[in-house]
């Protein structure tokens, strides 16, 4: 996609401000699809008619978490197993004069506009309906690089209510339209075509999810590091960066993005390999003489300490680590790397040699404009307690582990 001349984010925002549609495409490593996106404030019957005729996808409306709470838009399901964690709520129709079955272009346009109208309330809608709201993560594309977050971000940047219409664009044969077809759409209808990657870069230059709170020095058993504490504007958690040497020179930097594991990092739990990975990463950075370890407060792959301990109990009953999370209603891995990416950007890191076995982490960081020039494994020899855990991460979560684990169990 780098050889294609995409439109600027500024030009797309101006079109949305003027009530026009834009085409937004995401990364080839993710859904690799294009969506029509517009601000809910400017939706018309003509626009809905055009979208249903030309795009043929599902009409959805992206709303903020706050707006979803105001309108009591509850999750469509309690256990979301969507591949890309698309956060659907229960579908709705507007309760308003002239709205009948909810399916006409007038009915759907009215529902969409009312979802963005601050005067609307929970009782303004019937459930289920013909419009599908989606809850965007707080922080937008800086937290999740999806069309849902892009729709909210673009509407907000255009000075509209942070509620956006989006619809996937399908090919004539019903398959997903990819970049060549989307370029034809752009030329045929005179629409702007932008990428979520460019929107992330635009917001990274203008908006911050974290700020430096304090800097200090920390002598450790592995060496002395500069320690920088960050405060998140989104969840108000404190995250840390252990820094060795000059990491802002432009040369590739040895990097580890490590999520908190109190049981492993602090108490040397044998259930996981987290504590040993943390120690190994710090040793490797010290030996290198230059590098960063970002420590994110995402306990238990994002489910928190209490739920992690509940998952331990389920594992003792015979469930593996993925099944235990699913039994509790969670995806196998709820971590996001937007905050970690902003910390690395703040430190001046642009190219990295990433210490990880996790392919999701590679994709997650690359989505924020950071170049991973090399992936280095961080393998820990299994013990009799965590061998099945490591096998599960390899076999079910795609972790690139080539340790002396044996398939089975």
Curated annotation (Swiss-Prot):
Mg(2+) 1 binds at residue 31. Its cofactor is Mg(2+); Mn(2+); Zn(2+). Pathway: Cofactor biosynthesis; riboflavin biosynthesis; 2-hydroxy-3-oxobutyl phosphate from D-ribulose 5-phosphate: step 1/1; Cofactor biosynthesis; riboflavin biosynthesis; 5-amino-6-(D-ribitylamino)uracil from GTP: step 1/4. D-ribulose 5-phosphate binds at residues 30-31, 35, 144-148, 168. One of its GO terms (cellular component) is cytosol. Mg(2+) 2 binds at residues 31, 147. This is Riboflavin biosynthesis protein RibBA.
């Amino acid at each position: 996609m780098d050889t294609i001349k995409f439109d600027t984010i500024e030009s797309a925002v101006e079109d949305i401000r003027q009530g026009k549609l834009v085409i937004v495409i995401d990364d080839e490593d993710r859904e690799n699809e294009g969506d029509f996106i517009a601000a809910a404030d400017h939706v018309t019957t003509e626009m809905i008619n055009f979208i249903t005729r030309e795009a043929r996808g599902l009409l959805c409306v992206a709303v903020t978490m706050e707006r979803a709470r105001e309108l009591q838009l509850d999750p469509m399901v309690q256990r979301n197993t969507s591949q890309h964690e698309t956060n659907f709520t229960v579908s709705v129709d507007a309760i308003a004069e002239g709205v009948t079955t909810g399916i006409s272009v007038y009915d759907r346009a009215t529902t969409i506009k009312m979802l963005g109208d601050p005067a609307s309330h929970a009782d303004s809608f019937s459930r289920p309906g013909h419009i599908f709201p989606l809850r965007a993560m707080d922080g937008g594309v800086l937290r999740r690089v999806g069309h849902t977050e892009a729709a909210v971000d673009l509407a907000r940047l255009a000075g509209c209510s942070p509620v956006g219409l989006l619809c996937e664009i399908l090919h004539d044969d019903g398959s997903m339209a990819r970049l060549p077809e989307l370029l034809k759409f752009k030329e045929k209808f005179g629409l702007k075509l932008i990428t979520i990657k460019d929107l992330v870069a635009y917001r990274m230059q203008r908006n911050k999810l974290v700020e430096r709170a304090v800097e200090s020095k920390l002598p450790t058993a592995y060496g002395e590091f500069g320690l920088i504490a960050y405060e998140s504007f989104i969840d108000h958690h404190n995250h840390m960066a252990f820094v060795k040497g000059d990491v802002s020179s432009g040369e590739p930097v040895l990097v580890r993005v490590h999520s908190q594991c109190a049981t492993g990092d602090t108490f040397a739990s044998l259930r996981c390999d987290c504590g040993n990975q943390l120690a190994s990463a710090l040793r490797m950075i010290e030996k290198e003489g230059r590098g960063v370890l970002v420590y994110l407060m995402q306990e238990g792959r994002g489910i928190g300490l209490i739920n992690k301990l509940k998952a331990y109990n389920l594992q003792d009953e015979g469930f593996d680590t993925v099944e235990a999370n699913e039994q509790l209603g969670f995806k196998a891995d709820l971590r996001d790397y937007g905050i970690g990416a902003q910390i690395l950007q703040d430190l001046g890191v642009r190219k990295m040699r990433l210490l990880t076995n996790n392919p999701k982490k590679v994709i997650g960081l690359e989505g924020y404009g950071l170049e991973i020039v090399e992936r280095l494994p961080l393998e820990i020899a299994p013990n009799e307690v965590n061998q099945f855990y490591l096998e599960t991460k390899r076999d079910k979560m795609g972790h690139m582990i080539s340790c002396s684990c044996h398939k089975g169990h």
